[in-house]
Amino acid sequence: MISLKAQYGLKAMVSLAAHYGKGPLQAKDIASSQDVPVRYLELLLSQLRRARLVDATRGKKGGYYLAKKPNTITVYDIVTAFEGSILFSQNGRNESDNFAFVWKNAEKLLVKHFRAMKISDLIPKLR
């Protein structure tokens, strides 16, 4: 349903949220705390930068930081940065299918849930 890439991206974003206001975090530190290979995490962070959720500074004290306040970034923002959208109804299913309403309703519920959940709400889950 939700890719491993999006799951790791969410974990990285929550790590950055927990560090918000304390300066940038280096990719290696995020990677070790989330048990993700550094090179893979850097690819994810670059995708989050393109989505304007993360920014970075170069140099010895450089690293990554949130581009917005943690209480304004939703799980939906992060998942769609990786997935593009959350669609159950078009996963090879015909819209005229008698059960298309099931997938549409599931999609609406998940989108509503992800939009309501801020990454700041997930910080306690890191510990």
Where are these regions (language model features)?
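Beta-hairpin "wing" of winged helix-turn-helix
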Residues: 53-66
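N-terminal helix-turn-helix DNA-binding core of bacterial DNA-binding proteins
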Residues: 2-10, 14-36, 65
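Basic amphipathic alpha-helical segments that dock to polyanions
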Residues: 16, 44-49
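C-terminal regulatory/oligomerization modules of transcriptional regulators
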Residues: 91-127
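Alpha-helical residues within the helix-turn-helix
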Residues: 32, 49-50
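Conserved segment of winged-helix/HTH DNA-binding domains
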Residues: 70-94
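Key DNA-contact positions within bacterial/archaeal DNA-binding proteins
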Residues: 39
